Every structure is written in structure tokens, then in C-alpha cells.
Amino acid sequence: MNMHGRRRGWSLMVSGGLLSAMVCAFLLSGCGKSSEAEIAPLACLAGPDAYLTALDGAPDKVELSGGTKISDCLVPRQSGGELATIGADLVAAATTLNSNAIDDPSGPSSLRAGYLLGAVEKAAWSSNGIHTDLVRRVSAAASYIPQGDDPSLLQPGFDQGLEAGRSRG
């Protein structure tokens, strides 16, 4: 093969590679636009204390600032960063409520922990599975019972809150 044949072959390979890359980029750019991340309300990013304050109204009126329900914080196609931030805040709030409920089982924290879990479950039902792990984490944090303690320690307040959160969360 002469020198021109090698150049021509190389030129076709480079052009073919560029064409393939351009087609892939075009197809991927179209895909990204149809599945853009949804954004949760700003009130959902106010930290765990905002959730704890809102839960003071459980089992009745539980709202973050601006009338935002806890279930509104978990949206379909949520970005990973936003989900991580909101998820950490929800788990922190659930952990605080659980600790308070263990210290005072007859107090309101058990009901509030149940409500929080119910609201997270409600949101997760319509989010195509992206919040499944968060539901498990909030459930573990909200319903934790230390080894050796009575498993019914948090009931019935927890169950009442759970049902309220699932329906009104």
C-alpha cells in the first residue's frame, strides 16, 4: 500500500470516529432535555430544624414555610445532590425525634416520627423508586429501638403519626 492509501484510510477512520462521536452527542443531548431534574421547594432545604418545627403540628397541620408539605420535598427526577441534602436533613430529624421518643415514650415525638416516615413514604410512592433508599433510612432512624427495650415502646403514637403522614403528609 502506498503512502496516499494509508493517509486516506487514516482520514476515513478519523472522519468516521468524529461522525460517530457527533451522532452520540446529538442523541445524548436530546435525552437530557426530556429528563431534566425537578427542583423541590426552597423550604425543603432549610435544615432538620425546619422539619422538626413543622412536625410540632402533627398529626394535623404539618407545613414547612410557605405551606410546603413534607411530601412535596421529594419530587420525581430529583437531582442526586438535592436528594442527598434533603435526605440527610430528614434522617437527622427522624433521629432526633426517635431519641426524644425513647426518652419520653408518652410524649409527642413518637407520633411526630411516625408522621415524618409516613410523609416520606407518601412522596416515594410516586417517584419511580428513586426515594426507596431514603424511605429505608428514615424508617430505621424513626423507629429504632435499643436492644433490650420493649419493641412496642413507640406504639401507638408512632402508628397514629404514620397513618396521618401517609394521608396528609
Where are these regions (language model features)?
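Extracytoplasmic low-complexity, Pro/Thr/Ser/Ala/Gly-rich segments
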Residues: C31-T95, G165-G169
